[in-house]
Amino acid sequence: MSAIVTELLSTGLVEETRAGISSGGRRPIILEFQDQASFIVGIELGATHVSCVLTDLRCKVRASWSAPAPVRDDPDVALEKMTMAVRSVLDADGVDLSRVLGIGVAVPSPVDDERPGELLPLVAPKWEGYNIATHLRDDFGRPVFLDNDANLGALAELWWGAGCSSGDLAFIKVATGIGAGFTINRRIFRGSRGIAGEIGHTSIDPNGPLCVCGLHGCLTTFIGTPALLERAEAQLRDSGSNRPPPQNIDDLVNAALEGDPSSVEMIRYAGKKLGIGIANMLNLLNPRTVVLGGG
């Protein structure tokens, strides 16, 4: 035990603060965890934005940064934004790069252990040949960890959220696309080549729209953000409404909250389609807990 404490003291992760109350013999020395001994950078790479946070070792956010970016269409701009984001959060809190333990990146794509740092070409074809982990390591010289955003959402819920008491959890992320992260016995289930959890590419209508993956009627083709906005615009046009079409999901939700019948119907439509996908997943995996999230 003393060897472990000595090592923790040498790294600065714990600190001797005061003498405790003795129950017999020498008074003990109280040790306290130093949550600002080091820091962690987290990056979320969305389909249309880059967000970044700096946290201490208790995961308390100390600085944040976010900006729109054409992530799917322009990898060079997205990588530039990521570099800018990391520098911005470090500068905002006055943290030297040497105190950063590592950089974690959440990406809207499966991550293959055989191609770490890369996005799946089928999901993000314009990222072919780009390696996010290599780019960030070259820029900052710190360890970089990359994983699917829904997988990381599942881990967050498992450790700090709705799944704390459950080892079997499904985290469903509804955003530009639809993804899922599964934990089984408190471990992420990745499947072969990290593609487990692509619930957005499960077909709920074999006669439905053609998806980029080659299937027809994938969940994403019905309730992914582009599909919902396109459907909402068509409904407004057909109804003769003077309301401008929604430019994003916030516009659609706000219109529904204001009582716009067409927008309310769109939300119900999305809920029904999502319910079909979740029901299929429940019958297949039977997780104890299901968490819905977005991005």
Regions found by a protein language model. Give the residues of each.
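ATP-binding/phosphotransfer module of carbohydrate and carboxylate kinases, centering on a glycine-rich
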Residues: 2-99, 140, 166, 206-207, ...
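General beta-strand structural signal in soluble alpha/beta enzymes
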Residues: 14-17, 144-148, 182
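Short glycine-rich anion-binding loops that position phosphate/pyrophosphate groups of nucleotides
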Residues: 20, 108-111, 176-177
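Short, glycine/acidic-enriched loop or turn micro-motifs at the edges of active sites
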Residues: 47, 152, 176
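Glycine-rich phosphate-binding loop and adjoining helix at the ATP-binding site
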Residues: 61-168
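Short secondary-structure boundary segments
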Residues: 107, 148, 174, 225, ...
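Flexible loop/hinge segments that line or gate small-molecule binding clefts
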Residues: 130, 176, 253, 257
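Glycine-rich phosphate-binding loop of actin/hexokinase-like ATP-binding domains
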Residues: 160-223
